[in-house]
Amino acid sequence: TRNVMVCRMSTEPEWVESQIAFVNEEWREQSELPRIYNRESRHANTTRHDVVIHNARLDEDQYNLDGCGYTLINHQTAVTDFHNKEVIADQYFPEMKSVILDLTGAHAAFSFPFYQVRSKNPANFFDAYSLYMHCDFSPDTWLQFAQHIVKESGSSEEYPEESWDFALYNFWRPIENPVEKDPLVLIDARTVERKDIINYRLIEEGDKAQAAVPLFNKNQRYCYFPCMKLDEVLVFKQLDSRTEKSLVCPHTSFIDPNAAPDAAERQSIDIRFMCVFPKQT
């Protein structure tokens, strides 16, 4: 019998201690952007910090998309093969679109044309689980990308920014087996300061491929959901143009000290939706 983590104890422990890599503080005041595009550049531009990561399952009455920026839902999918692109497009995207509309009350939701299935042994650096705290999009350029998603969807409606607000969400789900190691950790969006978010590039040269990373701040609160099961989906916010809502929920994977030595490798699927809301007047 394998010595796997006992998932019935998902409400324990209350917290774990681990290390999370953050972009180096030296980049805070630089006009040039850091570049992280492979293992070597990640090591050169990040520093590990000792942190306490709280068990979010104990705070079920506290988490929501507009406050802390994340929520955990139960969802039984009809999809049995997450490696089949046609099945993902024809079945999983429509399933999740229905969920995000119900969760947010958005006027409309548009799926991103790409998604990621992550594993420990990926085809390239960006298909691996991330090992540094990051945001998937830049707060400075994401609204242009949101409009691009609407246009590419073939929508007959237009959503000018003076009349509509936008929010980006991730759906993160384990596949093949429950999460026994390398779970996802999130920063509670209520503890993220805008001044701590800086842009970076995901390529070695040029001025394309821009995203964002948070700098370490001792006031940040870190949370995770231990032992995520196959019928659980972690929904979290990427960005939001509504000023009264939380802005962003940075995230990464981390080494769980409670994982068994022979724990199964984590596999997960990550898809994204852009939602539109009429501006409140």
Each predicted region: which residue ranges?
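N-terminal mitochondrial targeting presequence
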Residues: 1-2
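Catalytic core of Fe(II)/2-oxoglutarate
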Residues: 211-281
